[in-house]
Amino acid sequence: APFAMNHSDWSKKDLEYIWHPCSQMKDYETLPPIVVDHGKGVNLYDVDGKRYLDVVSSWWCNLLGHSHPKINQAIKNQLDSLEHVIFANFSHRPAITLCEELMKKIPRGLCKFNFSDNGSASIESAMKMSFQYHYQTGNRQKVRFMSLSDGYHGETLGALSAGGLDLYSELYKPLLLDIVRIPAPDCYRCPRGKKRGCCQAECIDAAQEAFARHGDECAALLVEPLLQGSAGMRMYPPAYL
């Protein structure tokens, strides 16, 4: 019976059938995947009952902890009324209510919401929207994009093109878009020898030069908000943003 299997059994079965994302499958020969049974708060428990502290918040997505009673109840309530509906030509009250509440918290000038199911897909949609905007307003030469060096935007082709980390993109370079790359600010290892808080944000000069040189052909600039996570948690200087 499946529930009579131990953690080692489940790990072997996992590796027989599954490719895991963002990892080297060869590493699993010596460090098998942890097979999780359930979670509670900040803790995860494997199928043998061993407890783990979820210090990465399940890839930064679980801000309120596992099995939060309010969230669980809301999910159960929703399942009893509507589990899924096509979003083209249809809508539903939870989506409308959510957008209405979010509108109260976002900066002025932003007035519409577009849903996607993951970060990479949202980047792809944003790139297509920005291109289409310029195409429909007579700027059809704007067919390229700018992004910062060492950035990370996702694993799909457009998002991977915008990223600046060879660890993720080196193999796929023949497939990727031609991106205008701008040197990212790095206050910890400032190439100009400046100190954060005492400089004039000279790192913006490279961005201004890129805009002057390539602005007429670029549809958008892609920037991670607040910091570059995969580059080593690099915080942007406020003046740069």
Predicted regions and their residues:
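A short, flexible beta-alpha/helix-coil linker loop
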Residues: 58, 81-82, 186-189, 225-229
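Short beta-strands and strand-loop turn motifs
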Residues: 53-56, 183, 220-226
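Active-site core of PLP-dependent enzymes with the aminotransferase class I/II
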Residues: 199-200, 206, 227-241
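Short acidic, glycine-rich surface-loop motifs adjacent to enzyme active sites
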Residues: 214-232
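Active-site-adjacent loop/helix segments that line or gate small-molecule/cofactor pockets in enzymes
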Residues: 3-40, 90
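Glycine-rich loop-to-alpha-helix module at the N-terminal edge of alpha/beta enzyme cores
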Residues: 7, 51-140, 146
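Active-site and channel-lining beta-strand-loop segments
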Residues: 33-55
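PLP-dependent aspartate aminotransferase-fold enzymes
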Residues: 100-219
